[in-house]
Amino acid sequence: MRKRLIAALLIMLLCMGMSMTAYAVPQITPEEQPPAEATEEEAQAFKAAQLKKYYDMPVATNEIKGWPQGPGTYGEAAIIMEAGTGAILYGKNIDDQHYPASITKVLTALVALENGKMDDKVTFTHDCVSFLQPGDSSIGMKENDEITLEQALYATLLASANEAAYAVAENVGTNAGHDYQWFIDQMNARCKELGGTNSNFVNANGLHDENHYTSARDMALIGKELFKHPEFFKIVQTLQYEIPSSGTCQQHV
């Protein structure tokens, strides 16, 4: 029982990013944003009202007779899934489509673990780093840097490094005899194989794209599958990780 409860909690934590930060598809309408001429005080009040609206959204599992009542959340969607059985213990708008942002990298890790080896070489090409904009999550990898897939997954999952996620996808795809797009196709295929019906992924790092979206249920199904990969949980439970300097890479923490 204790292991099953821990598994359910881990599924909840994997999906927490969506419940707290995701934005729904279709796009936010003008009436859902503070007026352009609003003062800072008015904008804060507007945002507080939006959060209250999300908090007051009904929780579907609270409608089940005799089921424990779950709390509200300040997100538009949330889920707790029991990893052993797939039973949904808590659900709020679990099939609504949202922009997943960096929790995309959870699926990137799954596809990489299923198709690569931890000691595979990952080379950062021009495409891996050229898209980065100021403010994007990055550990500062440069073109032609080389690390292992294990190190790249640490960078992807601990630092949310966008260039590392791209490099993981590109190199795993290349090693399989294909390319970056093949990896993205595998992400979509695996999501569907796991029962996902409300997702479409167009990149490996979650940088915003109107055609890149998922749902709380789909992400929980992906998280459930990751219990077959203990190396994933070893990575995400690490507090700090250092990529040592080498002849092909500078030190990164």
Residue spans for each PLM region:
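Intrinsically disordered, low-complexity sequence elements enriched in Ser/Thr/Gly/Pro
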Residues: 1-2, 92
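Extracytoplasmic
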Residues: 218, 223-253
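Terminal recognition/anchoring or ligand-binding modules at protein termini
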Residues: 13, 177, 234
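Active-site-adjacent loops and short helices of periplasmic peptidoglycan-processing enzymes
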Residues: 25-217, 221, 226-227
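A general structural signal for well-ordered secondary-structure junctions
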Residues: 15, 118-119, 162, 197, ...
